[in-house]
Design a protein with these regions (language model features):
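Short, glycine-/aromatic-enriched active-site segment of Class I SAM-dependent methyltransferases
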Residues: 127-150, 154-156
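Conserved S-adenosyl-L-methionine
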Residues: 166-173
Length: 173
């Protein structure tokens, strides 16, 4: 699956980058890491602003497309080990992005521990994920796929991040 085939998703990615870069004053001294970065569809918008990026993408064929498009990409599944490797390579992040990745994670605690390791003390993480309550309330069962390990409520996600020493400060629907 290549995210860049969806015009509406590309527009969403551009709007997100414009908002987050302006709101948190990201610049050429910032470092942005996207987990499950796909073909670089989102990170290319940071690159256009001169902001250093790194994608972490487990699918080698998809990561190769990102690399061909000039997006610095590491082929790996993200978790504590990958985060330690990246910090050893001087890739502590001002911003970590995870869009629609939580459902694919087999060990949520290892994943969130990795986020905490990779994040600079003053950095922030943004996560987009399907909300379990909306899935049930609006009968969105067509969003359930066999490759998803879990679907989370907002409360469950908040508790996991809190347990790993991170504080939630903004939510959008």
């Amino acid at each position: 699956y290549f995210s860049s085939f969806s015009d509406s998703w590309l527009a969403h990615a551009k709007a997100y980058v414009d908002m987050i870069a302006d709101r948190f004053h990201l610049n050429e001294k910032s470092k942005v890491v996207e987990i499950a970065s796909n073909d670089g569809y989102l990170l290319k918008n940071f690159v256009a602003r001169g902001i250093p990026v790194l994608g972490v993408e487990p699918a080698a064929n998809v990561a190769e497309v990102a690399k061909k498009n000039g997006i610095n990409t590491k082929v790996a599944f993200f978790g504590e080990r990958t985060a330690l490797d990246l910090t050893n390579d001087a890739w502590s992040a001002d911003l970590i992005i995870g869009n629609n990745v939580l459902a694919h994670v087999p060990d949520l605690n290892d994943f969130v521990k990795g986020l905490k390791i990779l994040l600079k003390p003053t950095g922030l993480i943004t996560m987009e994920f399907p909300h379990l309550l909306q899935l049930m309330e609006f009968n969105q069962f067509d969003t359930i796929y066999h490759e998803h390990f879990s679907y989370f409520s907002f409360l469950a996600v908040e508790q996991v991040f809190t347990r790993h020493g991170m504080k939630l400060f903004d939510v959008e629907e």
